Structures are given as C-alpha cells and as structure tokens.
C-alpha cells in the first residue's frame, strides 16, 4: 500500500513537471542548497515571531489576571478615552443663551487660571533651578579656594623659576591692583603706621577701620566694624600668652556681656526704625523711653491679641510681652517698671527679678535660682504664653534645649537668648538641661549647625556675626577670608585683633589657615595670621609695593621657623617681586651716598635688609640687581664678585650700542671710578680679577675696532700670555692663580693674540720690496720674532692645565703654520 502511494505521488510529480515545462512563458526557477536553507530560515523566523508575540500576550494575561485585571477590558477602556474634551475650543453660543455664556466664562476663567499657574510654575522652577546651580557653583568655588588656602605653605606659590639671564626684565609700571575698598583700608594702615613709627600715642586701629567703613556706604560693613569695636572693648587680662587670657573665665564673661550689649542695642535701633516707619500704627506717645517705645512696637508686632497669653495686661498690652521686649532692648529698669505695675499678677517673680537686675553679672543666687527653676518645671514649662517661658528661662538659665522659636524667630534673637543663658560657674547640682557653657554653645554653632545651616553664600555677614559674637574670632575671620568679596574686611579685622593681642595665632607657618593644636582646650582654634597677610598682599605686591610694605610692618616682631624676621623676609620677596629697588631700598648717588627709600621709615638697620634682598636676588640668578644692592649696602667684596661673573661671559663680545656688554661695561667702569676715588677696595684676588677683566674689555674693544698695534700693546702689558719662549713657564705658573672668570676667556684671548700676530705677519709680507730704509735683515728678524711669539703661544696652550673650548688648538696651529 505504501508502494502504491509513492508510485502515485511520483506519477503526479512527473505530470506536473511536464505541464510546467510545456508553458514557455514562465522561466525556470532554480535554487541551490544554500538559497533553500536561507528561505527556510526566513519562514522559520516569521513563525517564531508570531509564536513569541502570542507567548508574551499569554504571559501578560497571566500576570495581570493574577491581580484581577482583564487585558481586553483595559484595552477597550483605553481606546474609549480621549483628551479632546479637556482643552477643546468652547462652542459658540447665542447672545441670548445666558447659561451657555456663563458656562463659557467659567471655563475660560478656569483655563486662564490653569495656564497662568502653569506658566508661573515653570518660571519658578527655572528660577529655583538657576539659584540652585549658582549656590552649588559658589559652594564648589569656596571648597576649592578653601582647599588651596588650607594646604601647605607653597599651595598658592605661582612664582616662576628664575630665567638663565643675568638681569631681570621688569615691565612698565601698571595700574593699581587695589579696588576702592582695599585702597580705603590701605590709607588707614598708612596713618596707623605713621603714628607707630614716629613714637606718638598709638591710635586705635579699630576706630580707623570703622572710619573707612563708614565712608564705604555699606551697612553690612559698617555694622561689622561696630560689632568688632563692641567685642574688643574688653579689659585685657594679664597672662603669659593670649591663649590663657582668652580662655580665662573673666575674659569670656566680658565677651558674652559685650555681645549681649551689642545685640540689645541693635534690637533697640531696629525697634526705633520700625516704630518711626509705622507711626500711624505704632501710636507713639508718652514719656520718651524704652517702655513707651516697646508699647508702640507691640502695636506693630502684636496688632491683634494672641491667644494663650497669661497674667493679664497693662494698659492693654500683655505683661510678659512687655517684660520680654524691654529686656530684649537691654533696659532692665523698664522691665522692672512693668514688673512693679503687675506685681500682684506675677507672685514671687518680682523678688527674683529684682535680685537678677541688681547683680552685675545678671545672675541669681543658687537658692533663688533653684527655687525659680523648680517653679518653672512645675508651672511655667507647660504654659501657653511663649513670652513668659522665655523670660523664666533667661532669668533662671534653665531648659537650655528650648529654642523659643515663637519669640526668637531671628538668628539675632536666638543668639541673645542663648547667650543670656550661658553660665560660667561649675554647678554640680545643675542638670544638663539647665546648663549651657560658652564652649558648648560655640561647638553647637560652628560644628553642629555649621555653614550649611546659615546659608552663608547668601548671608555671609550673618554667619560672621554668629561666630564673632560667640568669641570665635579666628573661625569668623577664616570664613570671611574665603569669600573674595569680603576678604579685605577679614584681613583688617585680623589686624585689629592682632594689635589688641586678642588673636590666637598658629605656632607654625605651615599650618592651615584655621587649625587646632593638640593639647589645647576643645573648640580653641588658631589662625595662621602670617599666611593670611601674605595671601592678601600677594594680589597687589607687583603694582602697589608701598602699600604692601605697610602691611608687612605688622610682622616686624614675628619670626619664621628659622628664627628670621618675617618683616625682613617679606620685604625681600616684595622687592624681588616688584623690582622697585630704588623706590623701596633707596638709590646710590654718583658721589657714593645713598638716597633713602621707603624702607628707611620703618627701620634704621637698612643695611641688613638690603643685604638680605641682595642675597635673595643672587640666589635667583639676578646678578646685576644683586650687585647694585650689595653696592647700596657697602659690600664691595660681593659687588666685585658678582660684577666679575657678569663681565666674564661678555668680555670677548663685539660691543654695540645699548647691548648687554655695553651696559655692563659702563656699570663696571662707574664702580671702578667710584671705588678708586673713594679708596674702596675688595679682597685682593677679587679686586685683581675685576681690573684685569676691565683691561681685557679694553683689549677686545681695540681688537674688534681693528687697532692691531694698540691691542697688541695692551695684551703685552697685561703679561697674561707669553710672547717669548723664555716667558712660557712663567706664564703657565701664573695661570694657576687666575680665577675662573679669566680662564673662561683664555681661548678667545689666545685666538685674538694669534690673529694679531698673523695680521702683523701678513702686513709685513705685503709691505713690498726691501728698501734702503728697511734692510732685508731687519725684515727677516721681524718675521723670526713673530714666528717665535706664535710658537710661544702654541707651547703655552699645550702646557696649561686647562681644557680649552672647541677647536682652539687646531686654529692656533693652523695660523702658526701659515706664518711658517
């Protein structure tokens, strides 16, 4: 049966093939095995795609079906949804269709409100995004700057390496690098130093800076210096060093007292401004004083009664609010006036308050304080009157964890309230919640809250105020110095504290700008004052060296790690950087006298400073400047030593107007003439080398000018090289005594001398036939002498223990051969 099936199938296939071949219109399609395989793969992939899609649909149905969702139903719902009706245009209505008109107006109003809100939202988002980016960039910049300032001593040292030239190229003086604020401060520094140098009564640097700040017309800066003046107006406690003085309880109490006075006076001024700005609402009247001022202020601050206030009113004003704001303005007598008028409503508080205001340290006795604290915990802590709670916490110095944000809603109010609670006595019986020390408060502000809490990029002066009023002077200055726009203020605050001996300075120059040293009390930080000053002056040293000198004078008693005066070191670097040698150090007149410079005003020992600057210039390779400075300091040995180094490379050069050689030659001749007239001399070897170099300059000048006979006479008188066989050994022995400055020029001297001999020989040979005036025997003798002199030079060149440059020997031999 199977055989019949295959046979029938074969017969049908053959018949089909025959029919196909009979149709001539259709071409034959032939495929090889590879094409058949590719076609099969394509068919298979299509089948697999459909299968995988169906499989994915099945899996999705199973997943969503397990959660109770029907895919087909969801698809139908999605297809039925349309957003066309959300913002479709309003249909036109007839003029008489009131309902349709109102509906359209309502829809229009809604759509307009939505669109306006959308635009406003996008604008706000853009502004927030931009502000956020600016803040982030500012933070990054400050971190980078802080990293640079806090790194090693040479972190910001961009000084270029000294060039190989012997004289520095100083550019033309440019415009001042100081802006108007920096220049205003610089003028005050000049006035201050003038008084100090002249020995007059030393003025207050704080007062001078305050005057400068008032002329700047910047309220933030003016307030800053008013605060600095207030905080520094404390009696200096006798102590062996600033650290002991600053950490003494008496000094810290004085700082807190001054900070409270400043905050109270500032708030009273704020109250006055608020009242006079709203006279109609304030209804100011009555006897001038704090009490009536506070009453008027409450008309603005509390225009409507606040629920929860306790213990009644006085003349329509809450009792505790009156007491609090009188205390906040620093007028305890006005607060006592309120307490006396409301004594029947306040119970025993009157006695506690009287004891508080009559104590110079604003402190209750331990018995009264414990009694008040107990009453606070039992009855007042749960009170709904925020002013009452605040007054009790201030007088009893208790519950220090409560920030009283209802009444102390500003940073200054918070500072005043917490500083009022600071205690200095060791209270063994006090619980931690009733004890706040100044170091604890300092740590809370600087470490726990920090810069991020106070938004320092928007309000840098506020954070400075927070740190400064809590006696964290060094941290406040270091923060303000990091901001470019406030850097000059930070530097001058540091100078003011430094002069008042209130600044804690770093003990090492390599310390960070703000650092803590081991073994010192926690929270004590030191400022690298020297680094601070040098970083500030670096900006304007090249353009304003006189102003920089005024600042460096503050370092006159400071020493570096090697014990050297920082004033001396800074002046040296300043002179080298600015190239203002004559202006700063003085100028040497033609008669040898010295014209004073800017440095003479600050010290009598100018010679030491000039020698130091000259040494620095010499180490940097600035030999010409160093020689002039040593000349200014009356140090002839160094003057001639450096001049010899300068002259040696240019001795054999051809002189040209305004060339390096011409300038050095004139300088050396001026020195030689002045020293000769004044009888000044240096060490014998240096002196002889100097004058020998001058003679060699004369020799080469004559030689290059073509004056053969004159140049020969010069070299013959110098007796530097032998001109006869008899003097060769003598000259070789003398060569050992010559300095390197002479030896380096020996090759050129020998070549020039040999060239002179060869020129004379050629001139002799080209002078024509023998005449009666010049017998042949004389000419032959002259030839013999020239050849003998040339041979002596060759012998000398071979005997000296010195390796001459290049092909000197070959050239000497060549010219000597030509003469034979």
UniProtKB/Swiss-Prot annotation:
It comes from the Eukaryota. One of its GO terms (biological process) is nuclear pore complex assembly. Transmembrane segments: none annotated. One of its GO terms (cellular component) is nuclear periphery. GO terms for molecular function: structural constituent of nuclear pore. Pfam families: Nic96 (PF04097). It is a peripheral membrane protein. The keyword Nucleus applies. Keywords: Membrane, mRNA transport, Nuclear pore complex, Nucleus, Protein transport, Translocation, Transport. Its main location: nucleus. PANTHER family: NUCLEAR PORE COMPLEX PROTEIN NUP93 (PTHR11225:SF4), NUCLEAR PORE COMPLEX PROTEIN NUP93 NUCLEOPORIN NUP93 DEAD EYE PROTEIN (PTHR11225). Plays a role in the nuclear pore complex (NPC) assembly and/or maintenance. This is Nuclear pore complex protein Nup93. It comes from Xenopus laevis (African clawed frog).
